Amino acid sequence: NNPTTLLKSLDEKPKKNWLRKIYECEDEKALKFFLKDKNFENIQLIQENLSLLWECCQIPDFVKKTYGNHYEVIGNVYKFLSSSKGKITDDFMRLQLIKLDKLDGNVDSLSNRIANVRTWSYVSNKKNWVENQNYWIEKTKLLEDRLSDRLHEELTKTFIDKRASILARGLKQDMEFKT
């Protein structure tokens, strides 16, 4: 019903012996962050908004590098879902994916983009969270596939370059021994 009750219930030990409590899960940390944020004080008044915020806090952090960025994603999603429209707009989704639709870069940058696309894929797959849900599900899937193919190429190239370098060094040493 209220933030205090929700946090208390999250802190309880599981009733089943074979389950164990994991302290400070990512979604719980996110919820505590937003409950302390002055911009989100109004959620305490409406139970639906608190449930919605909790659901948004459960968006997985696939990137796992920058907490601020993940909290920004959660905050943006929550603001759209709690607005009068109640859904993330096509324009917002388009802007998020345009930033990620780049096939250049090294293994780390490609992996990071894939992780970010997975976040938006998760959001797209949540029922009634985005306008034109089927379109965005397909769009995120295609973008993730393209980035994954490019990552595979980059990994293969890196592996082959290292292997060729090792072989070349080995051949050079063999030639030095023979002369």
Task: Walk through the language-model features, giving the residues of each.
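C-terminal or mid-to-C-terminal helical accessory/interaction module adjacent to the motor/catalytic core
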Residues: 1-45, 51
